[in-house]
Amino acid sequence: MAVVSLLLFGGLWSAVGSSNLAVVTCGSVVKLLNTRHNVRLHSHDVRYGSGSGQQSVTGVTSVDDSNSYWRIRGKTATVCERGTPIRCGQPIRLTHVNTGRNLHSHHFTSPLSGNQEVSAFGEEGEGDYLDDWTVLCNGPYWVRDGEVRFKHSSTEVLLSVTGEQYGRPISGQKEVHGMAQPSQNNYWKAMEGIFMKPSELLKAEGHHTEL
């Protein structure tokens, strides 16, 4: 329902499933695909039975699951205006739309692989500095058809999937965790969603480049 309501909000320019916007922007609501394991970043009101006990974050193969939408926001204690292009090297927050908790990591051990736990934390979009992730990509901006990595700004692990699979109550879902080593397991791509129209800033920069 949260995603549907965004479509009805005045002034938004939606591009669900289309590719006519080159850059990813603040305020966009997207699904993120781990390109190595073909699963989308997912969360739900199911808590880890070990580690932090916080809300679990997993990877799912379903394309249609509404629990895989994440809102792109500025880093903790900042505001990133809607439509602002995300620069490579910029710290951001990813807020789970349906529960209002932020993608988060800390020095707890993940339950299946023994890597660093990744959870969803906070209330109504507000958590702490451990919710910040730096976008790693080539070029000036995060582009929609490009692969990116997300580096945890505090602990420096990379958001990863290596294929470990949960049993009940979330049978078939893959573990998402943090890893220190860069590999094919930590590449992500923006897929379905509601993409905000890029701001005038990007247009102005493009104009100056042409001059």
Curated annotation (Swiss-Prot):
The answer to whether UniProt assigns keyword Secreted to this entry is yes
Q: Which UniProt keywords apply?
A: Repeat, Secreted, Signal
Task: Give the SUPFAM superfamilies listed for this entry.
Answer: MIR domain
Designated name of the protein: Stromal cell-derived factor 2
| Residue ranges of domain MIR in the record | 21-75, 83-138, 139-193
**Species of the source:** Bos taurus (Bovine)
Is Secreted included in the keywords of this UniProt record?
yes
> Can you cite an annotated GO cellular component?
extracellular region
Q: Which gene encodes it?
A: SDF2
Kindly give the PROSITE patterns that the UniProt entry links to this protein: MIR (PS50919)
Organism lineage: Eukaryota, Metazoa, Chordata, Craniata, Vertebrata
The main location class comes to secreted
- Using the record, list the residue span of the signal peptide; answer none if the entry has no such feature: 1-18
**Localization:** Secreted
